[in-house]
């Protein structure tokens, strides 16, 4: 059955990743009952898991980190589920559909950050921290200021990510399911709160695992059917795609996506270092028992995500052949029905019929829930653990801390729903770019230098971290996306779309300069404590494991 999907503006490249940020107006669609039934099955099953998890959440450790008893394989699958989004699936395949080989290059940008996490961060992070990355950043530095900075960096990233997720969720669900936008946003918000409020990290982990399995299965089936169509020959795949694509052989050439070298470098640095500074990703490394399992988590996650991005490349070229060359998927003007971001959805219909289209639509919805649940838990832990229990109310009991965390979940959920409704017709794609830039410019430098640079002091971390955060925000506002496209000015003050190259440089230089010039007695004590921190980060001596974690 042909589904009529209305025109949808293509999201900015950053939105192709984890924001599910589908921008532009959409109209109410016919109800997709197959998708709704499949999604209801997923919801009932995951709510059952949440009920099961709620019976096992008895302590702060259980709530924040699932007691540290998630295996490396399970955590790797959950990390992949947390990182691979609906728009990663739709957006990257759409990028391949329109730009060919450049889409593969762009997708690699989201993978290059993982070797950094594997070799530089995962092991030491697990050995030094308990619940949040602020535990690591403040290990030998002054607790109050560093936790405030880390929590602010986390909350800004979470807020920007969450708004983009909620708006994108409403648009995507309205498009795929035929549900009203406001109903879709409220539904996502309520389910998100239920998962995190009652099941904590254990429920969130299993929602992410199930979503990852479903997404990998769906993408694998689509790629298999595409390869079957071309006799399992990549040569045939590329030859047929070039024959029908308007750009012809140019789709096999790189360099057309970001032609300015500074923008390309800035985009790459933002993707690479931003990944290593995302709070909801870093939090996952505390769910395993030790550093060895943390390393295994990254290994498995990288494997799953690498496989997924290879699948999106095949799906994108399959869409060129089976969707782009099929008039049934074009509107009267010759454009793809629903916009280029719907290329993978149309391909699902082409290779598996309406039933498989319903399955892919349900998986897209499940994907959104998995991502927002992880974001909400990261935001709640930043407020309850970093700010409440370690800054404003030192010595608070576990019960008090958990109460604050659950109140924060409710507040974040309500705010996310309200902002999701208010931003319905706004261009929110820039929020994902800003979230990555802040994660790369504030969170990542502090985490990295706190673990590796013996001369880091509280003064340097504070001033450099705030400089990086503010630089990223200011340059993003003055850049082409916000200053010209949103605010309507004729010319951008800052000429580049991605600020990461400059804001990361400012952060590292600021941290180095203000630490190097810090001759205070407190700064000298912090330098002396690095050796003890280094030994623990390398050996894990003193780290609590398992349920005692």
From Swiss-Prot:
It is a multi-pass membrane protein. It is found in: Cell inner membrane. GO terms for cellular component: plasma membrane. PROSITE patterns: NA_SOLUT_SYMP_1, NA_SOLUT_SYMP_2, NA_SOLUT_SYMP_3. GO terms for molecular function: acetate transmembrane transporter activity; glycolate transmembrane transporter activity; symporter activity. The keyword Cell inner membrane applies. Coiled coil: none annotated. Keywords: Cell inner membrane, Cell membrane, Ion transport, Membrane, Sodium, Sodium transport, Symport, Transmembrane, Transmembrane helix, Transport. GO terms for biological process: plasma membrane acetate transport; sodium ion transport. The chain crosses the membrane at residues 33-53, 77-97, 103-123, 148-168, 183-203, 206-226, 262-282, 303-323, 355-375, 404-424, 428-448, 464-484, 493-513. InterPro entries: Cation/Ac_symporter_ActP, Na/Glc_symporter_sf, Na/solute_symporter, Na/solute_symporter_CS, Sodium:Solute_Symporter. Transports acetate. HAMAP family: Acet_symport_ActP. Belongs to the sodium:solute symporter (SSF) (TC 2.A.21) family. This is Cation/acetate symporter ActP.
């Amino acid at each position: 059955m042909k589904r009529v999907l209305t025109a949808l503006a293509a999201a900015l490249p950053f939105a192709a990743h984890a924001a599910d940020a589908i921008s532009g107006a959409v109209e109410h669609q016919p109800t997709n009952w197959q998708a709704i039934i499949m999604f209801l099955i997923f919801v009932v099953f995951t709510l059952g898991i949440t009920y099961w998890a709620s019976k096992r959440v008895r302590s702060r450790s259980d709530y924040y980190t699932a007691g540290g008893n998630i295996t490396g394989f399970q955590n790797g699958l959950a990390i992949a589920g947390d990182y691979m989004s609906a728009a990663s699936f739709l957006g990257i395949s759409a990028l391949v559909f329109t730009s060919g080989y450049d889409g593969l290059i762009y997708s690699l940008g989201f993978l290059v950050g993982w070797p950094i996490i594997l070799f530089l961060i995962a092991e030491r992070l697990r050995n030094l921290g308990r619940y949040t990355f602020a535990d690591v950043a403040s290990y030998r530095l002054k607790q109050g200021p560093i936790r405030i900075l880390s929590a602010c960096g986390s909350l800004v990233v979470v807020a920007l990510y969450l708004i983009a997720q909620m708006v994108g969720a409403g648009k995507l669900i309205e498009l795929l399911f035929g549900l009203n936008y406001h109903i879709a946003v409220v539904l996502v918000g309520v389910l998100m709160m239920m998962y995190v409020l009652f099941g904590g990290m254990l429920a969130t982990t299993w929602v992410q695992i199930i979503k990852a399995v479903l997404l990998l299965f769906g993408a694998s089936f689509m790629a298999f059917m595409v390869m079957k169509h071309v006799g399992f020959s990549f040569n045939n795949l590329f030859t047929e795609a070039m024959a029908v694509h308007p750009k012809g052989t140019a789709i096999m050439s790189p360099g057309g996506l970001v032609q300015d070298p500074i923008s390309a470098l800035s985009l790459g640095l933002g993707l690479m270092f931003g990944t290593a500074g995302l709070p909801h990703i870093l939090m996952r490394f505390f769910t395993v028992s030790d550093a060895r399992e943390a390393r295994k988590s990254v290994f498995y996650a990288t494997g799953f995500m690498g496989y997924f991005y290879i699948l999106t490349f095949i799906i994108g070229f399959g869409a060129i052949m089976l969707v782009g060359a099929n008039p049934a998927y074009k509107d009267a003007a010759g454009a793809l029905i629903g916009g280029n971001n719907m290329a993978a959805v149309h391909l699902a219909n082409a290779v598996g019929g309406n039933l498989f289209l319903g399955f892919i639509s349900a998986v897209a919805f499940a994907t959104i829930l998995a991502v927002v649940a992880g974001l909400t838990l990261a935001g709640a832990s930043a407020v309850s653990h970093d700010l409440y229990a370690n800054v404003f109310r030192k010595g608070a009991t576990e019960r008090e801390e958990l109460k604050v965390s659950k109140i924060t979940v409710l507040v974040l959920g309500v705010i996310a729903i309200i902002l999701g409704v208010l931003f319905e017709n706004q261009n929110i794609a820039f929020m994902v770019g800003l979230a990555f830039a802040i994660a790369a410019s504030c969170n990542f430098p502090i985490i990295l230098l706190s673990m590796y640079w013996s001369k880091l002091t509280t003064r340097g971390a504070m001033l450099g971290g705030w400089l990086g955060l503010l630089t990223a925000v200011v340059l993003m506002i003055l850049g082409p996306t916000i200053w010209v496209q949103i605010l309507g000015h004729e010319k951008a003050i800052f000429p580049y779309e991605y600020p990461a190259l400059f804001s990361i440089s400012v952060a590292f230089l600021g941290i180095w300069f203000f630490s190097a010039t810090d001759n205070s007695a407190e700064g000298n004590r912090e330098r002396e404590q690095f050796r003890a921190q280094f030994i623990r980060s390398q050996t894990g001596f003193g780290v609590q494991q398992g349920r005692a974690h």
